[in-house]
Regions:
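Short helices/loops that flank or line small-molecule/ion binding pockets
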Residues: 46-60, 65, 154-169
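Ligand-binding cleft/hinge of the Venus flytrap
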Residues: 26-34, 111-112, 124, 130-151
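Short helix-loop capping/hinge motifs at secondary-structure junctions, enriched
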Residues: 102-109, 143, 202-207
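A ligand-binding cleft/hinge motif common to bilobed small-molecule-binding domains
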Residues: 63-77, 162-191
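Short loop->beta-strand "edge-of-pocket" segments that line small-molecule binding or catalytic clefts
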Residues: 10-20, 112-131
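Flexible hinge/capping segments at coil-to-helix
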Residues: 91, 100-121
Length: 255
């Protein structure tokens, strides 16, 4: 008898590649406590979805803004997501915006303030979903990134951006509200996002994936997400096709 099929055998390790986020960290903790082993690798959204497409992971954590930036953001994942073979597990809504020092001493209120000569910015790394969202917003408002002091100074997590500002090395950054609160920074909300786990549809009925879904749908997980500043668990646990998730499913592009 195969070890994995024996009665009482430990659940198979779930390989999760995910963009950094606080709901993901909460999921990891609760999954581990429930006895489900998770091999988590934090990487940017595009790398996470690409790894799922190549069969290198079982779940891919990525985020897409709601509203006017949804379509161009979703389109970027079209190279790897397939409407027939992939499904999305809704993890959480979250709010992205500007981190500034307590009391906002420089009077930063919008993206246009990032171009001011007296403002030092710290960015996320190239390829991160958060940086992609910021660049879409800058383009809409016709703000040239080259005019932003510190645009090429990068950190790899929301917390690292917040810590950089809290330590006095920058005046403003862009990320999720939870990180700003944890480092006692003020926060200026600019965008709402949905965070998803992408999964192969055929794996949804496997025991390990059923346990993933059970954790995400549990009251304890939803309650924990609600406690995170800027997070909302309203649709947490919903399983969606790409066309259900987006007004138009991302077109799978030719390789």
């Amino acid at each position: 008898t195969e070890l994995g099929k024996t009665v009482g055998a430990a659940p198979a390790m779930i390989r999760l590649d995910a963009s950094h986020g606080f709901a993901v960290a909460t999921f990891l903790r609760q999954a581990t406590e429930s006895g489900l082993p998770i091999d988590l690798r934090y990487r940017n959204s595009t790398d996470a979805v690409a790894a799922l497409s190549r069969g290198e992971s079982d779940l891919a954590g990525f985020h897409v803004p709601t509203g006017e930036f949804e379509a161009p953001s979703a389109e970027r994942f079209g190279k790897w997501l397939d409407a027939r073979s992939h499904r999305l597990i809704h993890l959480a809504y979250r709010t992205q915006g500007l981190f500034v020092n307590p009391g906002n001493p420089l009077g930063i209120h919008s993206l246009s303030d990032l171009s001011r000569a007296d403002v030092r910015f710290v960015n996320r790394q190239v390829g991160s979903g958060t940086r992609m969202l910021l660049e879409l917003m800058l383009s809409q408002f016709e703000i040239n990134p080259a005019t932003i002091n510190g645009f090429e100074n990068t950190e790899f997590t929301h917390s690292a951006v917040a810590a950089f500002i809290a330590s006095g090395m920058a005046d403003v950054g862009f990320g999720v509200q939870t990180a700003a609160e944890r480092f006692k920074l003020d926060f200026i909300p600019l965008a709402r996002e949905r965070y998803f786990f992408a999964v192969n549809a055929e794996s949804l009925d496997q025991p390990g994936m059923r346990q993933v879904i059970d954790v995400v749908r549990s009251n304890s997980f939803r309650d924990a997400v609600h406690q995170l500043a800027g997070y909302d668990a309203t649709d947490t646990g919903e399983i969606l096709t790409l066309s259900q998730a987006f007004n138009a499913a991302p077109r799978k592009q030719a390789a």
